[in-house]
């Protein structure tokens, strides 16, 4: 087995630190494991995303260690009737939202009024 890269060692260290910091806090260990499992399939070549998630994890670790956190959880958004069911697009985005980066305000459509003014 090859040696881990520096970034891999940092991520593994962060994982262990988060598990230690989450001991005694309801839901923390399960949340840490779930978050790391969710992103385990990221390709090694996606360094920017891995570094972003690493920094985000570092901030969460600081919050857990600060003493202000008593538990750890997550907000889960359920699918609405207007969301795509095939999983296309980013998670949590509505269908048609952000399809064209040149028109960012198109998703904020205003209702059309009839020509007769009613």
From Swiss-Prot:
Gene for this chain: SDHAF1
Function text: Plays an essential role in the assembly of succinate dehydrogenase (SDH), an enzyme complex (also referred to as respiratory complex II) that is a component of both the tricarboxylic acid (TCA) cycle and the mitochondrial electron transport chain, and which couples the oxidation of succinate to fumarate with the reduction of ubiquinone (coenzyme Q) to ubiquinol. Promotes maturation of the iron-sulfur protein subunit SDHB of the SDH catalytic dimer, protecting it from the deleterious effects of oxidants. May act together with SDHAF3.
UniProt family annotation: Belongs to the complex I LYR family. SDHAF1 subfamily.
Any one cellular-component term (Gene Ontology): mitochondrial matrix
Annotated protein name in UniProt: Succinate dehydrogenase assembly factor 1, mitochondrial
Originating organism: Bos taurus (Bovine)
CDD domains listed in its UniProt record: Complex1_LYR_SDHAF1_LYRM8
Any one Gene Ontology BP term: mitochondrial respiratory chain complex II assembly
InterPro entries with a match to the protein in the record: Complex1_LYR_dom, Complex1_LYR_SDHAF1_LYRM8, SDHAF1
Superkingdom in the source lineage: Eukaryota
Chain spans, region Disordered: 72-118
Self-association and partners: Interacts with SDHB within an SDHA-SDHB subcomplex. Also interacts with the iron-sulfur transfer complex formed by HSC20, HSPA9 and ISCU through direct binding to HSC20. Binding of SDHAF1 to SDHB precedes and is necessary for recruitment of the iron-sulfur transfer complex by SDHAF1.
Keyword flag Cell membrane: no
């Amino acid at each position: 087995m090859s040696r881990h890269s520096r970034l891999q060692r940092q991520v593994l260290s962060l994982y262990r630190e988060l598990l230690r910091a989450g001991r005694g806090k309801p839901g923390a260990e399960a949340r840490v494991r779930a978050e790391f499992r969710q992103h385990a399939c990221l390709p090694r070549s996606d360094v920017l995303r891995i570094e972003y998630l690493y920094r985000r994890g570092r901030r969460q670790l600081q919050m857990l260690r600060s003493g202000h956190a008593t538990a750890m959880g997550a907000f889960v958004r359920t699918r609405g009737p207007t969301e795509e069911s095939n999983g296309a697009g980013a998670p949590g985005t509505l269908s048609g939202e952000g399809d064209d980066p040149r028109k960012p305000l198109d998703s904020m459509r205003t209702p059309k009024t009839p020509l007769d003014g009613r």
